[in-house]
Regions:
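A generic secondary-structure signal
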Residues: 13-17, 46, 93-94, 163
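Charged, glycine-rich active-site and insertion segments that engage polyanionic ligands
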Residues: 52-55, 61-167, 171-242
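Conserved adenine-binding aromatic site and its adjacent loop/helix in ATP-hydrolyzing domains
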Residues: 13, 45, 68, 72
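Conserved catalytic/switch belt of AAA+ P-loop NTPases
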Residues: 16, 41-58
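Charged catalytic carboxylate motif
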Residues: 6, 38, 42, 167, ...
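Catalytic acidic motif of RecA-like/P-loop NTPases
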Residues: 30-36, 41-48, 64
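Clamp-loader machinery-focused feature within the broader ASCE/P-loop NTPase space
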Residues: 1-38, 200
């Protein structure tokens, strides 16, 4: 999260210092939806009467989390996401990634090139990728105690739960896609084709729909501050049964 001290230290305490070499002083708050209510209130005092040279960008994918007083004092500029193919092309050309890696980063970025670049350089994301691959490949044979241990490990390693849900949504999307089309080229996780093929053969359409619905329910529960371990346990049990 972005706390009140972050806003005070990085914006409020420095905005009065005039720029030296340009007419504007620009602040960019990435993932601004992570600002706490206290942080938003601290920023509000600044954006009500900013210096004429100051420009503050609040970058977000979810404006609904902002206080109405923040939204009313901002000009909203809506940017369309890039196509996955455009993000992938950039990653291949500029970061020299393997095509299979670029497919995964482009999917997770959801049209946000900056996020794709960050994910490609993130060790935390590589850990998440490894952990989640193990889970989806072995879930059917794991007993309840192993599932609970896995959930606790996610919590201890402070892995991004929303990205975990994204991973599972993309994975089972691939399973369903391959079950319908039998086209490897349509997969996000192309390198995992053998496992995806195996799961698609043993899972029915109704079961896969139940799994995807359970992921959506987990998102809703986490957003409503339901206990994290309970939300994931309920989801994983549905996945195991289907």
């Amino acid at each position: 999260s972005i706390g009140v001290d972050d806003i005070r230290r990085q914006i409020n305490d420095t905005i009065a210092i005039r720029p030296y070499s340009s007419p504007y002083k620009v602040y960019i708050v990435d993932e601004a939806e992570k600002m706490t209510v206290q942080a938003q209130n601290a920023l509000l005092k600044t954006i009500e009467e900013p210096p004429s040279y100051a420009v503050i960008f609040l970058l977000t994918t979810n404006q609904d989390v902002f206080l109405p007083t923040i939204l009313s004092r901002c000009v909203q500029i809506k940017l369309k996401p890039l196509k996955d193919s455009q993000v992938k092309e950039y990653l291949l050309e500029h970061l020299q990634l393997k095509e299979a890696e670029a497919d995964v980063y482009a999917a997770f970025a959801r049209g946000n090139l900056g996020k794709a670049i960050r994910l490609a350089a993130s060790e935390d994301f590589k850990i998440l990728h490894t952990e989640m691959l193990y889970l989806v490949k072995n879930l059917k044979t794991m007993d309840i105690s192993e599932i609970l241990m896995f959930i606790r490990r996610l919590k201890e390693e402070d892995i991004d739960l929303l990205e975990c849900l994204d991973f599972m949504q993309f994975w089972y999307r691939d399973v369903l896609m391959f079950k319908v089309t039998k086209d490897v080229n349509l997969l996000i996780f192309k390198e995992e084709y053998p496992s995806i093929n195996e799961i698609s053969q043993r899972s029915g359409y109704e079961g896969l729909e139940n799994i995807l619905a359970s992921i959506d329910k987990a998102r809703i529960r986490l957003a409503a501050n339901v206990n994290m371990e309970l939300a994931l346990e309920l989801m994983l049990l549905v996945m195991k049964e289907n």
